[in-house]
Amino acid sequence: ETANACALDRCIMHCADNFHWADKYPVRDMGNGKVRAAGMALAMQGSCISNVDVGSCTLKLSDCGTYNMMIGAADMGTGCDTILAQMAAEVLDCEPDDITVFGADTDASPYDSGSYASSTTYITGMATQNAALELRENIKKIGAQLLGCDASEVDFDGKEVYIINPDGADNGAVSVSLSDIATKAQVNNTIPVDVTATYSSPVSPPPYMVGMVEIELDKETGAVKILDYQAVVDCGIPVNPNLARVQTEGGIGQGIGMALYENVTYNAGGKIAENDLMQYKIPTRQDVGNINVEFETSYEPSGPFGVKSIGEIVINTPAPALAHAIYRATGVWHRTVPFTPEKILMGMADPNWHEKDLRVK
């Protein structure tokens, strides 16, 4: 596939400027056995599984002039209900509050492959856009009937259908309200005001991310403290920048947990040793340092409103960026997560150490 939208070069420069890479990259001796170093990583991901993922959306004009939207995607905290409502509202020239979203119900919802593979905004978003465009055209057709003219002569501004050039209108009226159209849709009408659109993409355009991290490493204990993490993401056009930002911040936190803390080991009986949160360590807010997230935009022509995905890419850069920073601080590459203090000390003590198996036997 050819990447039609890529702002990775701008992401690198933006990230380096905000992070002050030139100042933080040199290894600095802080005394007491502690050094500071910086690392960076680049990542790309997909926006769906091309030719596999399917998303659908049903939009219905209610009798009070608002809309109901039914989707098969489940909002698991990613904010897809909000984002898809925003997309429909943009096409229908209304407020997102005018759209009531009904989430996944296998008995009633249109089919969706699922909220996975970073595909909801890209795949179900396109289905939502297409459904909204079709419903908009049907609203114009019903409005044109009430105005006694052809649908090509009217437009819709979200509140009423109006004649673009009112001269010569048969019944003298130049506009009809959305509520009147909703009422007309229930009487002697053959134009549907509930439409379903389904979409699957032949391509999977990649979003991009740059992550830069500054650490302080204690050479006497192997402990790593994160000071700053700067991220710049190209996810196409961010439909909801606030949701995109917190999605990125959360993913960075998860990536830091994977890189430094989280591990699964098995005892001799085959049972997981870390079977509760007392043993399975995840980072808290004080463990992730200062996180700053910015965006560089690109327009993806195959996505709704130019979007690409952001779901999974945000977890990809912390581990390699931290590995780079630890290498800068110690001269040893670590390739198996988590990068625990024990592994870091072993690596500094034995240059030929290759991360021997530390699992419980």
Language model: regions and residue ranges:
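Generic recognition of short, well-ordered alpha-helical segments
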Residues: 10, 54, 82-83
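Conserved beta-alpha junction segments in alpha/beta enzyme cores
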Residues: 38-66, 71, 78
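Short, contiguous strand/loop micro-motifs
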Residues: 71-75, 309-310
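C-terminal catalytic domains of large/alpha subunits in multi-subunit enzymes
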Residues: 1-41, 45, 87-361
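Thiamine diphosphate
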Residues: 80-88
